[in-house]
């Protein structure tokens, strides 16, 4: 692990391990220096994380802090969006998982937004959202829900809504629907013959990459090849 540091004009490690943010120091020692560190739960007691938890609502969500436009807020699930964002911060920055009761509450809130089809819906009103569905799934997997049947259901939905080329796109975009119009419409089915979106496919693949079984699936490999084909165009 040390050889790569010799290739750099400036060694970043001293700055990282002397950072005031204890989480940065922790993961630098653990993931970069391969040092033995204290249990991850030590990060859960940091004041930064506790401050975030103080804003959690009774239903497990976090309230969106902005004002927004009222006619859009009535159609978009802003609290789901904010809870997704906050969960990402807690999981990725502080290593929290479902051993913590407040993470379980947040997960329960997000799972309450999962439909019978398997997608997580509401951020685009009634419309399908492979990107947000997969992004939420990625965080839930990292939080310890990889073996949960609701995650399996989500993957089955993602596989069912692929474009014919093997990638993903936002369904209402494939029929050229305007965003504001889509928010007020019934579910818009995708035109699967349209080409995949490299942006959406990249987000969806993050959920596959986080899952022990699905990361090696032929569908993930195919989508990865498609995504790689868009590099340096």
Residue ranges and their predicted role:
Residues 1-233:
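Preference for long, amphipathic alpha-helical scaffolds in soluble/luminal domains
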């Amino acid at each position: 692990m040390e050889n790569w540091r010799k290739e750099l004009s400036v060694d970043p490690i001293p700055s990282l391990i002397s950072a005031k943010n204890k989480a940065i120091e922790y993961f630098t020692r653990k993931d970069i220096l391969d040092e033995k560190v204290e249990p991850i739960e030590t990060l859960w007691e940091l004041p930064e994380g506790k401050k975030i938890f103080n804003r959690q609502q009774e239903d497990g969500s976090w309230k969106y802090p902005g004002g927004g436009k009222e006619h859009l807020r009535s159609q978009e699930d802003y609290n789901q969006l904010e809870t997704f964002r906050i969960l990402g911060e807690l999981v990725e920055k502080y290593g929290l998982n479902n051993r913590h009761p407040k993470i379980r509450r947040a997960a329960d809130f997000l799972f309450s937004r999962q439909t019978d089809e398997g997608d997580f819906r509401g951020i685009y009103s009634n419309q399908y959202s492979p990107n947000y569905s997969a992004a939420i799934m990625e965080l839930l997997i990292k939080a310890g829900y990889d073996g949960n049947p609701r995650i399996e259901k989500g993957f089955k939905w993602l596989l069912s809504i692929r474009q014919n080329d093997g990638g993903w796109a936002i369904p209402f975009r494939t029929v050229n629907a305007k965003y504001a119009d889509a928010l007020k419409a019934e579910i818009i089915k995708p035109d699967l013959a349209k080409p995949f979106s490299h942006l959406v496919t990249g987000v969806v693949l993050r959920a596959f990459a986080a899952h022990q079984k699905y990361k090696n699936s032929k569908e993930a490999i195919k989508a990865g090849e498609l995504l790689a084909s868009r590099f340096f165009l």
